[in-house]
Regions:
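Bacterial N-terminal signal peptides
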Residues: 8-15
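Sec-dependent signal peptide recognition
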Residues: 2-8
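Sequence/structural signature of beta-propeller domains
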Residues: 17-354
């Protein structure tokens, strides 16, 4: 752990020598090359204009009718949208300040969990049920997730059951809390079963079910890997630093897919408007191997920049997305408010030669 801490400190100091005030053109020039793809669709803008508002997407795939799949996206100033793949916002539920979002299918339906930061001193998890036929969200209540301001959230599908969810709550101060959520007749209850701690601000997280690993993005430092099981050690390993080459701070959204018998981790390299794809080695202490980088360039729809949240899911999503769907928040959607861009996984896979 001393070696990891030293590496983290070195990265932090390096970041201090290269502030975000450096022009983005310079950051792009200094980073490793990235191939380009274009969006095949985009969502309607979030309702909050002239602000950093759109934040994080989650995808629900309709196996019976893939083209009828849905995207849940947060307006972190106001609530959650439900989008269809044509980009239209079919429903909005006011929820105030909600940052990240994730979802899972259970016996109780499609459960949506969002990080709720309406109280910056006491984080909460806001729970909803997604009705895919009506394309609506119904509030199921909130559960306390401990002191601090809520930022990231990810569900551990491999450790969740029909009546219980395991989630990781990423708190702005660097705390990562592993929480068991139970759905009762009077609303959800939460029990914190493990707490990890990183030194500075975090947000994005994702669980790899194959290796039972939790990945957490420390924005100015890099991606950390922890064992996901509740009884595992609370120490992690820095496996992908924000070195200005493979990733440029901030590291923001994280997403994971399994394809061809391997796991791929995708990270938003916010500082150079790119996305980095890593392999996930069996050795939990090994650096993540870089598989490639890509950007979403302007085409029929605009480019993306300064992306916060991302999500990717493989499978058939209809004729435009036959191999899978990648959704990315767009931090600059001028002259309109921020939104989410939709890209086919086939195009990303082909461009990177995966």
């Amino acid at each position: 752990m001393k070696k990891n801490a030293a590496l983290a400190l070195a990265v932090t100091l390096l970041a201090g020598c290269a502030p975000r005030e450096v022009p983005v053109e310079v950051r792009i020039a200094n980073a490793l090359p990235a191939v380009t793809v274009t969006a095949l669709g985009e969502t309607e803008p979030v309702g909050t204009s002239a602000a950093d508002a759109a934040d994080d997407p989650a995808i629900w795939r309709n196996a019976a009718n893939p083209a009828a799949s849905l995207i849940v996206g947060t307006d972190k100033k106001a609530g959650l949208h439900v989008y269809t793949l044509d980009g239209r916002s079919r429903f909005f539920i006011p929820a105030g300040l909600v940052n990240n979002v994730d979802l899972i299918e259970t016996r109780a339906g499609i459960i949506v969990v969002a990080s709720d930061r309406n109280d910056p001193k006491e984080s909460q998890l806001a729970l909803f049920r997604l009705d895919p036929a009506a394309m609506t969200l119904t509030s199921l209540g909130k559960a306390a997730s401990g002191p601090g301001e809520a930022y990231g959230i990810c569900i551990d599908a491999g450790a969740s059951g029909q009546d219980r969810l395991t989630v990781f709550a990423a708190i702005k101060d660097g705390s990562v809390r592993q929480i068991e959520l139970t759905m009762g007749t009077t609303g959800p209850t939460a029990r914190i079963v493990r707490t990890m701690k990183l030194a500075t601000q975090i947000e994005g997280c994702v669980v790899d079910p194959a290796s039972r690993s939790l990945f957490v993005g420390e924005e100015d430092v890099g991606i950390w890997r922890f064992a996901a099981d509740a009884g595992a050690p609370v120490t992690g390993t820095l496996v992908a630093p924000t070195d200005g080459k493979q990733m440029v701070a901030d590291v923001e959204g994280l997403a994971l897919v399994q394809t061809g018998g391997r796991s791929l981790l995708v990270a938003s390299s916010q500082g150079d408007n790119a996305y980095t794809v890593f392999g996930v080695p069996v050795d939990v202490a090994a650096p993540l191997p870089l598989l490639g980088r890509f950007r979403i360039a302007a085409g029929r729809f605009g480019a993306t920049s300064e992306t916060d949240g991302i999500e990717v899911m493989l499978g058939d999503f209809g004729p435009d997305y036959p191999e899978g769907l990648f959704v990315a928040q767009d931090g600059e959607n001028q002259p309109l408010a921020q939104n989410f861009k939709l890209v086919g996984w086939r195009e990303i896979r082909s461009a990177l030669g995966l």
